[in-house]
Amino acid sequence: MACRYGLKTSLMLLAWASTAFSGLPARAVQSTCAETKTTVEMSLCIAKVLEQKDRELSVAMQQVATDASSAVGGQFPRIWKSSLNDLYKTSADPEEQLAAFQQARRNACVYLNSLSIQGTGFGIFVSNCEIRMTDALMQSLGR
């Protein structure tokens, strides 16, 4: 089941991410990839960082689903699933949620790139933005 967030939702994610962190993850990526000498090396390094963060996010989202399904009383899981299905057009399946988040994250970061008139370093800019948004979600999940 593919999930497509609209521009409004993507921008909400973007606004949330930009207020949740004040540049700290970007600095962390810069220090992680500080030894790179070329744009290609930087792009590859940032891509690896993003892949690792997505693996960590997948585990965290699985834990959220596990916690929700074991909530006492059964009310929270119904409300949670209803919100995911009706409002966000996705499911309680963590893999579908991850895919939906990744698509919305990418859309928001590409849009932000166009707003900031970044002509060069598109991939690096977008990937750094995606890392910051992922870090913001992980912080929200308490991870």
Specify the residue positions occupied by each region the protein language model found.
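N-terminal alpha-helical modules
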Residues: 24-143
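Bacterial N-terminal signal peptides that target proteins for export
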Residues: 1-13
